[in-house]
């Protein structure tokens, strides 16, 4: 495919999904921008990936993802009703921001996807750090507005499900 809505990039193998994560996280031109379309064309088994690298990351400078969404997934990912099986994310580290799942940070659209697996994140947190975990998406950036704040965002998760376990903790304090 060419990445358009009419001709999306096709993902049929786990290695292609891993390449998507790499391209988004490294901001490879033509793959991480808004409105790039992807279509999952088969069920995937990620058992060959001992520790999955989430698609889309957040800032590492203490800001929240919506304050700096450049490395978030911003495209359209259509799971085509398929399942990503045996997801394993086991993050342990010390960063200012940790968000894990099949997608780490989403500011695009993820739809028609089923995920099964285990997601866990453990980090040493301070007042300027946090950890977030989810099966499909760790942090979904959505628009927000109230009397004092306006925040842009276009993250959407539609017709998706997760089966498995999710856990996150800051040091010895599970959240």
Question: At which residue positions do the language-model features occur?
Answer:
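Surface-exposed repetitive/solenoidal architectures
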Residues: 1-175
